[in-house]
Amino acid sequence: FTEHNVSRAIWRPPVTATAYVDASRVYGAGWGYELTIPPAQMVPAHGIWTRQELLKSINFLELRAVRKLLQREAPALANHVLLLWEDNQSVMYILNNLVSRSQEMQAELRLIMVLLEKYDILAHARYIRSEENPADYWSRLVDKADWQLRPDLAQRLIHRWGPRTIELFD
C-alpha cells in the first residue's frame, strides 16, 4: 500500500472491487456501504452510530464508515484495487492524500492505512453526489429489530419493579 502511494504511477492498476460508502446523522443515524467484488453479488451492510460517535463531525463519521467497511471486508478485499465512491469531498481528499489537519481524523486515517497495508489493498476515492450514492439508503435505514432501552431507564424499571423476567431489548 505505502509503496503505491509514495510515487504516483502514470496509470493506475485496474479496479477489481468497488464500494459506495456513506454516513448519516439523520433518520437512522448510521453508516452503510455497498461492496462489489466481481464476479460476486453486491454486499450491503449498515449499522447505527453510538452516542459517542454521534458527537463527532460528519466528516469524521464518513471516514469512520470507510474504516467499518474495511474492518468487515478486508479479508475479502485482500490484494484488490478498491475504488471507494464517497459523497464527502473532504473525506475523498483525505483518503487520496493520506493526510488531515484534524488530529482525530488523522488517527482514524492511520487505522484505515493499517488495514490497507495489512491486507495489501490499494484504494483510491472518487466523489459521487449524495443523490447518486446507493449507500445513502443504507446509512439512513432504521433497523426496527435493533431497539433497546436506554440503560438508565432499564435500571429505573428494575429498581421499581424488581428483577426482570422478560427481555428489556438489551
Where do the protein language model's features map onto the residues?
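Short, flexible loop/turn motifs enriched in small residues
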Residues: 24-31, 78
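Flexible, low-complexity interdomain linkers flanking nucleic-acid-processing modules
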Residues: 121, 138-170
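A short, polar/acidic, helix/strand-boundary loop motif
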Residues: 36-64, 72, 90-103
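Short conserved beta-strand segments at catalytic cores or DNA/RNA-binding microdomains
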Residues: 22, 32-41, 86
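Two-metal-ion RNase H-like nuclease active-site motif
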Residues: 12-26
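Amphipathic alpha-helical
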Residues: 1-9
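Beta-sheet entry/capping signal
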Residues: 16-18, 30, 41, 80-83, ...
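RNase H catalytic domain
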Residues: 70-142
